[in-house]
Amino acid sequence: MRRHLQWSIKQLTSSYADGQLSPRRVTEQALEDSVNLKTLNAFVRLTPEEARQQAQQSEQRYQKKQPSSGLDGVTIAIKDNFCTENVHTTCASRMLQDFVPPYDATVCSRLRQAGAVLLGKTNMDQFAMGAGTVDSIYGPTKNIWSEDLTQNNWRIAGGSSGGSASAVAAGLCFAGIGSDTGGSTRNPASYCGVVGLKPTYGLVSRHGLIPLVNSMDVPGILARSVSDCVEVLNAVAGPDGKDSTTIRQPFTKLQLPEVDGLDLQTVRIGIPKEYHCNGLSAEVLETWTKVADLLECAGASVQQVSLPNTAASIFVYSILNQCEVASNMARYDGIEFGHRAADERSTEQLYAQSRAEGFNDVVKTRILTGNFLLLRKNYDHYFEKALRVRRLIAEDFLKVFEAPSKEDRVDILLTPTTLTEAPLYKDFSSLSNRDQCAVQDFCTQPANMAGIPAVSIPIRLSRSGLPLSLQLMSRSLNEQLLLSVARWIEAQVAFDSLDHRLEQKLS
């Protein structure tokens, strides 16, 4: 295995600074490994010429002792729903197959300014509508932890940011950018055994992220450690004049305390009883219990809490998701945006044929359902009711994070991320998209509904040798404590994200 893959981003950039390694060498090896592991289908498009140019510029900065930031020369992959200047951005859909943006998403431009090396675009579910990265026009993405990548018994990478998660887990890059609307960064992080961060809504700009659900979409970060996630977050977070939903105040870069410097006796951990739900595997439950005990033994206060509207959240999320999808997808008419059909007998026919050819069945179903729910006769009964329940869900979190009594108040919530280990592709694909998301998003989408930060961290391997992960959530803009506790857990469990016999899969 490439020795530097075991290093953190800080260790990597230190090796650049002292001349032990060079950005060009690391980039070349990343491009080579990405080709050798093409069977994963993590990347839909590599950009080798751009990456080599960025690596060369980074190397020159290090030679002058003038690196741009702590990310200078670090290889990063970008999900294919973030606009990248002069590089195709397709959302893994025929509708945008020929779209080449003339500008960068803010996340991408800030990474470039930080000196990062952008390797290419990663696979995803079409328009991010899925939880498995299985319905892309480029084919499904495989999980590097699969027992056998060549047979029909391989495991899904999760979704919809499965390409970025798979690339990070396989060591093809040091970090990946995903999006997270209902768990699309944390879900694949859980299945692929990496860290997946969903920041507070508004902390990271959505400018240039092709929208799915404007009120919930958040750029996400995938990396092999919590510290690496922090390095990327520090580069991309903060106000953006191009996105009116970003925070107004300047972002203060996070500096996590040393693991031994975190006083857990001042931290209160909540265990939401509603997350002990149907379908939760015995191994995930056991992992959840052991980590709660680990925190308690180290001095943290651990108590059960209630989030009473959790059971309704998946239904509310589904309604709001489909309504916003119907609105956002209306722009793709074959004239202003998107694939254009050859049939131009009439404007109506052109619209209909372009959308029929450009969208897959999953996208069409959500559009149709969303438009039905938004009909005048249904608007109050479905959409407005869902908005009211969404407010109640957000208030559930406020009540536990900001309870008047200190005894009832918690700082962090500890839950499962996914209910099971990564399922086999053949089992997952036998379910409808609706059923897939109902299972996969149960534990993750409430954080999006409330706009709070959440992070998934790998804990251990299942008896089948697959990663099992847990999720931490906290109040808005409390990433400092959230990630400090996550890093403490990470240090205790010492999970190796690269312990999947990569050499055998490269040979």
Swiss-Prot record:
Molecular-function annotations in GO: ATP binding; glutaminyl-tRNA synthase (glutamine-hydrolyzing) activity
Domain of life: Eukaryota
Key words, A-Z: ATP-binding, Ligase, Mitochondrion, Nucleotide-binding, Protein biosynthesis
Pfam families listed in its UniProt record: Amidase (PF01425)
Known EC number: 6.3.5.7
SUPFAM superfamilies in alphabetical order: Amidase signature (AS) enzymes
Catalyzed reaction equations: L-glutamyl-tRNA(Gln) + L-glutamine + ATP + H2O = L-glutaminyl-tRNA(Gln) + L-glutamate + ADP + phosphate + H(+)
GO cellular component: glutamyl-tRNA(Gln) amidotransferase complex; mitochondrion
Annotated protein name in UniProt: Glutamyl-tRNA(Gln) amidotransferase subunit A, mitochondrial
Role: Allows the formation of correctly charged Gln-tRNA(Gln) through the transamidation of misacylated Glu-tRNA(Gln) in the mitochondria. The reaction takes place in the presence of glutamine and ATP through an activated gamma-phospho-Glu-tRNA(Gln).
Subunit structure: Subunit of the heterotrimeric GatCAB amidotransferase (AdT) complex, composed of A, B and C subunits.
Record GO biological process: glutaminyl-tRNAGln biosynthesis via transamidation; mitochondrial translation
Compartments where found: Mitochondrion
Family designation: Belongs to the amidase family. GatA subfamily.
Gene3D superfamilies for the chain: Amidase signature (AS) domain
Enzyme class: ligase
Active site: K79, S160, S184
Cross-referenced PANTHER family: GLUTAMYL-TRNA(GLN) AMIDOTRANSFERASE SUBUNIT A, MITOCHONDRIAL, TRANSAMIDASE
